[in-house]
Regions:
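Extended, charge-rich alpha-helical scaffolding segments
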Residues: 1-84, 94
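Short terminal interaction segments
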Residues: 80-159
Length: 159
């Protein structure tokens, strides 16, 4: 394997490992959401942030390899570099494909988790609005101490 391909291979291997960790955290978060263990959600924020910081660092290393070869620091530049090393280092192409697959998986899981969170939040907001309306309480306090009005758009009952 040429030295350039070895550097690229190590860089991609690092990104793959980082993405696997990130996907695992997203799957754990998803299980907490599915099972209603909402008190556990806060514990995922720090590992996700650490993963994203590391993935950003590793991605920058890959982009630097592209720039060092006078290529554009984007997907087109990466594909051009891979074509140059296709015969001498086919494992680098396989690593790139795995990276793309893991990236798509992470994106899908993150979107799905966001949808699950939004659904739970909507349900909580509707329940609070119903409770405040039934108790004829015009609002509540937000975390910063400001007043938050609770008004439903639907009449719950007519006496």
């Amino acid at each position: 394997m040429p030295p350039d391909a070895a550097v690229l291979g190590r860089t991609l291997a690092g990104e793959i490992a980082g993405l696997r960790t990130f996907v695992a955290v997203l799957r754990e978060e998803q299980q907490s959401l599915i099972h209603g263990a909402l008190e556990q959600l806060a514990q995922f924020a720090e590992p996700k942030a650490k993963c994203l910081i590391e993935l950003t660092r590793l991605g920058e290393l890959r982009l630097q390899v592209l720039r060092d070869h006078g290529l554009s620091a984007d997907r087109a530049g990466m594909e051009r570099l891979l074509r140059e090393h296709a015969k001498s280092a086919p494992q680098v192409l396989a690593a790139w494909r795995e990276l793309l697959t893991l990236t798509a998986d992470a994106h899908h899981l993150n979107d799905l988790n966001g949808t699950l969170i939004a659904t739970r939040l909507r349900g909580t907001q509707q329940a609070l609005a119903a409770l405040f309306s039934a108790a004829r309480i015009p609002g509540a306090y937000a975390a910063d101490g400001s007043t938050v009005p609770y008004r439903t758009l639907h009449q719950l009952a007519v006496a």
